[in-house]
Amino acid sequence: MEICEEMNKIEESSYYSKLLIKLKKKEANETKKVFKIPCEDPVKNNLKNSFGKDYDDEGDNGKSVISYSLYGNSPKYCEVAILNVKLAKSIYPEWKCRFYVDKTVPEEVISRLKQENAEIIFVNQEQSEIPGTFWRFLVIDDESVDKFMIRDADSLISYKEKAAVKEWLNSGKYFHVMRDSRMHNELILAGMWGGYNGVIKNMFGLMKDYLKEDMDVNRISDQVFLRKRIWKTVIQSALVHDSYHLGEEGKPYPDYEISDIEKIAFFHIGMIDSNSCTIKTEIEIKAKKVKWYLENENGEIICSYDSFIKKENGKQIIEINLPTFYSSKIKYNKWKISYEVLE
């Protein structure tokens, strides 16, 4: 499909993506454990909470959480994560951003996320033994959470998805799945789905059992897990938005507000934002490692990270992946990169 897209062979790309969806559904049909969907409407059902806790009609019926995994010290993930927390205040003001993290995330990033009122949960030793991409699914085991959305830390939330989420919440369906590219040929994209809590039980146990059986852990293991263990439960009561109708269950996206996010080149839900531009900065002093700073037009530090030096065409450089909103400021000389040598 990648080759078809690069060669602009749209019909072929769509054909093979639809075929892949069909084949993956056949694979998903082998799922043995399927959770039963409650008979009641999800909103009414969650007034008494599917975990068995009773709530008053006028009381706190649990939180709405946007769940992320975050690990490592790359601005490609950390800076987009911080932008998402800021964006959520206007796009999803009633939702709380939560990050499942480990100690590889810089303390400065953790502090900035907390300043923006994000929830930070450090995974424990047992949880840390499963791949980091799976951590965000732990929200499904949290009894305090009413409904959840699973998102990618390196993809910006948007008003397009807000419109889709609103339609889901009004649909009476327990789950929501989105596909927004011809390359989204998976049953559930790991960072593009959500649901009401209480249907799927013991998510951590399901993940551990799956990983014991499937030792071939790779960058899409989380999506394969969702296909093999979760899809059959989800599709019983799901609203699926699918821009290219790759699966027969898909429906078009509703109309949505156009903001600066939707105006980004090649925008689609789930787009890896920091892949659009790699900033290369030459280091003129001989060094192995530097701390670089991103400064705005007023000389204020936006962020700083440590980077190792690379050699390219006889020059010392650092390569930095930054959010589109940052890199565009650098492109037009409004913001700049400075650095100090560490090694």
Located regions from the model:
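Alpha-helical protein-protein interaction scaffolds
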Residues: 1-38
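Short, acidic, metal-binding catalytic loop of nucleotide-sugar glycosyltransferases
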Residues: 83-95
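Short beta-strand-to-loop acidic/aromatic patch adjacent to the donor-nucleotide binding site
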Residues: 145-154
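Short internal beta-strands
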Residues: 96-103
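A conserved hydrophobic helix/loop-capping motif in glycosyltransferases and polysaccharide synthases
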Residues: 66-74
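Catalytic core and acceptor-binding pocket of nucleotide-sugar-dependent glycosyltransferases
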Residues: 196-333, 337-338
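Active-site-proximal specificity loops/subdomain of glycosyltransferases
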Residues: 103-146
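Conserved donor-nucleotide/metal-binding helix-loop-beta segment in metal-dependent transferases, i.e.
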Residues: 157-188
